Amino acid sequence: MDTAAELEAIRRLKYAYFRTLDLKQFDDLGALLTEDVTASYEDGKTVLEGRDAIVTWLSAVLGDTGMVTEHHGHHPEITFTSDSTADGTWYLQDRVIVPAADLEIAGTAFYADRYRLTDEGWRIAHTGYTRVFEEHRTHSTLAVRSFRSRFDAPG
């Protein structure tokens, strides 16, 4: 096993997870998951099993184009548990902005992932996070002079 190449493949997998999440490309996000993937979001309040269930839930919770999300994964700690499995811990910094609700949520968390090497490459077999903190802010009082996103109507 070329450990450096496999580490890079897993890092790119998680980066793609965050990118497809923020761009609301849920079908593409689903392709990053194993079919039997499990997830534990919101400090274990939401536990899901299976690719379809996870993609459906993420789409329902984050798919509104009036909501913009920003997810950053930092400091990956990846440990190979075999030639075809690995565990990973990521430090998450995220933000959710909902201008119509005058709401901004910001926080940090630690993701705990399991990865499996499949015929298609590395895939996420489990993902979930535990919050370090989460704060809710009134978006309009943050001295924001203007706000626009890629999801706004042209014009």
Task: Name each model-derived stretch.
Residues 26-92:
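A solvent-exposed, acidic/Ser-Thr-rich amphipathic alpha-helical stretch
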Residues 5, 46-49, 103:
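A structural signal for alpha-helical segments
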Residues 62-155:
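A beta-strand edge to alpha-helix "cap/lid" segment located at domain peripheries
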Residues 9, 25, 30-31, 46, ...:
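Low-complexity, compositionally biased segments
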Residues 1-23, 27-31, 35:
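Short, low-complexity N-terminal intrinsically disordered segments enriched in polar/charged residues
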